[in-house]
């Protein structure tokens, strides 16, 4: 990856999908902590989706709410991320959903990358 400084503020980088703008100021791009939280949430959600599909658990939607706790005394360090999955479907087996979330946690590379430095917790709700 290569990051190029923007004249006004922040940096850009290019990926096959498109150009990504990153900056400490939301006027100029995504903030680094937003990208980190998004990476963890979407990685774990994507892994969970694959696990549910592989187990043939029929669901119609999966949403993730992420609550972030930051420590302003330590440069805004991310201390905790709570992921709340909202899974829509009929007659979803709660025990299999719980086990699938545990499996997703073990197989999400982004979550595993921060496991010893950021507390990550998960809950879910069936809708």
Where are these regions (language model features)?
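Extended beta-strand/beta-hairpin segments
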Residues: 1-38, 46-127
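Alpha-helical metal-binding/catalytic segments enriched in His/Glu/Asp
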Residues: 43
């Amino acid at each position: 990856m290569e990051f190029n400084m923007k004249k006004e503020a922040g940096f850009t980088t290019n990926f096959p999908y498109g150009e990504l703008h990153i900056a400490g100021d939301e006027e100029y791009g995504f903030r680094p902590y937003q990208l980190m939280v998004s990476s963890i949430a979407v990685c774990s959600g994507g892994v969970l989706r694959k696990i549910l599909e592989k187990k043939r658990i029929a669901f119609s939607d999966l949403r993730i709410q992420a609550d972030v706790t930051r420590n302003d005394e330590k440069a805004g360090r991310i201390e905790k991320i709570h992921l709340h999955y909202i899974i829509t479907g009929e007659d979803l087996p709660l025990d299999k959903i719980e086990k699938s979330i545990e499996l997703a946690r073990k197989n999400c590379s982004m979550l595993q990358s921060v496991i010893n430095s950021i507390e990550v917790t998960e809950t879910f709700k069936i809708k």
